[in-house]
Amino acid sequence: MTEQVQANEAETLAAGADERIIRETGIDAKVASIIEPVINTLGFRLVRVRLSGLNGQTLQIMAERPDGTMTVDDCELVSRTVAPVLDVEDPISGKYHLEISSPGIDRPLVRKSDFADWAGHIAKVETSVVHEGRKKFRGRIVLGDAESVVIESDQISYGSEPVVRIPFDLISDARLVLTDDLIRDALRKDKALREGRIPGDDLGSEEAGEQSDETASGEAEDKE
């Protein structure tokens, strides 16, 4: 990423463009409030923060470039930058393991643009309150409008509406479901971005079998 491109992306993010509609609570929210401005300054977008009890305590930070990519070098840059900030702010009690990663193929959907980018693919969506008689939905993402998304169920059950419109402000959690179609599309988009081509171009069947290791791992550190 060149300095000029990074500066442009940071400016866009700082302006609040395409903010997350799904946010953390509790200690995760506290960590997110500390690191999100730092990550934005680097030209990346925060996807999710989650503190788990895995291996003692693990602080997982998912981030990405505005184009959806995230390399190993990107993960290392974010790690080196946010680690000292967390040391100073000290939002977490005790020792923890810091893990920086890309969102992955079956990624969380946290922005309105995420639903648009992955329209046509299957997602699981949970709402904060009962909506249309339930709180959990699964189905194909159909583009809605600025305030909602339409989900077309891929597993029709008795008494459930096959097509549901869900307001964005009711969504508490959402993520893509791993399918063969999703894997092919994700790899095609990644390939297109790396080659400077437009996602959706016919890139050939061989490209669907390729996956870069760069977006599969990140840097992790132990912090006191």
Curated annotation (Swiss-Prot):
One GO cellular component, as annotated: cytosol
Main location: cytoplasm
UniProt-annotated location(s): Cytoplasm
Extent of the signal sequence: none
UniProt keyword Cytoplasm, yes or no: yes
Biased composition (Acidic residues): 203-213
InterPro entries: Ribosome_maturation_RimP (IPR003728), RimP_C (IPR028998), RimP_C_sf (IPR036847), RimP_N (IPR028989), RimP_N_sf (IPR035956)
CDD domains the record matches: YlxS_C
Region (Disordered): 194-224
Keywords from the named record: Cytoplasm, Ribosome biogenesis
GO biological process, one term: translation
Domain of life: Bacteria
Database matches in Pfam families: DUF150_C, RimP_N
Function recorded in the entry: Required for maturation of 30S ribosomal subunits.
Family: Belongs to the RimP family.
Name of the featured protein: Ribosome maturation factor RimP
Organism expressing this protein natively: Brucella anthropi (strain ATCC 49188 / DSM 6882 / CCUG 24695 / JCM 21032 / LMG 3331 / NBRC 15819 / NCTC 12168 / Alc 37)
